[in-house]
Amino acid sequence: MTAHLIDGKAIAANLRKQIAQRVEERRQQGLRTPGLAVILVGTDPASQVYVSHKRKDCEEVGFISQAFDLPSETTQQALTELIDRLNDDPAVDGILLQLPLPAHLDASLLLERIRPDKDVDGFHPYNIGRLAQRIPLLRPCTPKGIMTLLESTGQDLYGMNAVIVGASNIVGRPMAMELLLAGCTVTVCHRFTKDLAGHVGRADLVVVAAGKPGLVKGEWVKEGAIVIDVGINRQEDGKLVGDVVYETALPRAGWITPVPGGVGPMTRACLLENTLYAAEELHK
């Protein structure tokens, strides 16, 4: 058996097409164009690439994108004042603060400063709290994108044993809440977990987001399981690999995401989806 590939690139492209169509419909109806403000502090190469992709995505779907490229020495106060201005700007539906930030800045305080209705990354404690209470509003982009990928498989998630490897605030923890909402029995594994292989081997669905290349071995994967690999790691030869050993997982899994081309494109597409939602439902 060879796993079915979950083509995140194609699914994300279709989602962007739907968003672009809706933006055009709004334009024809005389409604305001959705706006996204993107804040980048410093010159981290990976962050610069991510931000450039997000800006291109905005252009593709017809959003108004505001770019704020700030020097590394930008102060906490200056960033706070910028966020306050964007919070008050009616043309801005979403505010994206690109992480990581330089060490002298307190990311938690800055993320909390973003108005919850403009928190299109879904990181604000208010939005995480709503997800925990089963009344999600703006949902974290990567878990939201993963749920869209899972829907594309047509598999019924109710009653599945789901294992998440990695307990970050960005992926692991909100992913657990999303899967609980979907009716799964959820186990979250982390650096202190004993017998990781055993947990993975019992999973009908495994989501790996640990940032460690090759952490999950293919032979651990249960026959027919769904494997979602969030990891994206660059090797010395420049090749991008995930947190799962893809070559050995492929013949065992029922469904699997490739790296690259799996989860990453969906994260970006869901940022756009959240921004459109904010414009249409929260900023009427």
Swiss-Prot record:
Family matches, as Gene3D superfamilies = Leucine Dehydrogenase, chain A, domain 1, NAD(P)-binding Rossmann-like Domain
The biological pathway it contributes to is: One-carbon metabolism; tetrahydrofolate interconversion
Q: Which reaction does it catalyse?
A: (6R)-5,10-methylene-5,6,7,8-tetrahydrofolate + NADP(+) = (6R)-5,10-methenyltetrahydrofolate + NADPH; (6R)-5,10-methenyltetrahydrofolate + H2O = (6R)-10-formyltetrahydrofolate + H(+)
Q: Which GO terms describe its cellular component?
A: cytosol
Q: Which UniProt keywords apply?
A: Amino-acid biosynthesis, Histidine biosynthesis, Hydrolase, Methionine biosynthesis, Multifunctional enzyme, NADP, One-carbon metabolism, Oxidoreductase, Purine biosynthesis
State which Enzyme Commission number(s) the record gives: 1.5.1.5, 3.5.4.9
Cite the HAMAP family for this sequence.
THF_DHG_CYH (MF_01576)
Q: What does this protein do?
A: Catalyzes the oxidation of 5,10-methylenetetrahydrofolate to 5,10-methenyltetrahydrofolate and then the hydrolysis of 5,10-methenyltetrahydrofolate to 10-formyltetrahydrofolate.
Q: How does it assemble?
A: Homodimer.
Q: What name does this protein carry? A: Bifunctional protein FolD
Organism per entry = Pseudomonas putida (strain W619)
